[in-house]
Amino acid sequence: MAIAPIRIVGDPVLHTPTAPVQVAADGSLPANLNGLISTMYDTMDAAHGVGLAANQIGYGLRVFVYDCAEDCRQTARRRGVVINPILETSEIPETMPDPDTDNEGCLSVPGESFPIGRAQWARVTGLDADGNPVTTEGTGLFARMLQHETGHLDGFLYLDYLIGRHARSAKRAIKSRHWGVPGLSWMPGEVPDPFGP
């Protein structure tokens, strides 16, 4: 098992768009990609996350892994990887997000959560770990995760989309925790679960 430190908001790799994974003419993927994917799964599992983008552990590649239910009330989860994802969504609501139903967290903003409006439905197309075409879609929590992870790969954190008092609360939290600077990370399994009880 290989667990990597998770970068915290302020690290440049989180705020830079990732590069597509290069696919060879024969359709094969880079030989070292399976090792990265394995580390991503191990890290996500150790952190109790529902998704993890490669740049969250310092790799500027367009890859994310997930282990996520359709919604918070379900125990059945879907697990997978998407390489070079392209996101499609339904319309994003223009109303103020509901703090009771629209809260979102991020492993790169450990222990914090803020309400954010997201599309109710999302789909990503890309490649699986073997280089085969893959499409995955969902609603609710699963759609939120797809939007969140592809946002990471585009160089954005969910904090970048917060509005009003929620954006101000996030700025205060970052300042009080002394985040927002390069080089900060946390190690899943070595510190208490930041989203746990």
Swiss-Prot record:
It comes from the Bacteria. Keywords: Hydrolase, Iron, Metal-binding, Protein biosynthesis. Belongs to the polypeptide deformylase family. This is Peptide deformylase. Its EC number is 3.5.1.88. HAMAP family: Pep_deformylase (MF_00163). One of its GO terms (molecular function) is metal ion binding. Pfam families: Pep_deformylase (PF01327). The active site is at 149. It is an enzyme of class 3 (hydrolase). The gene is def. Its cofactor is Fe(2+).
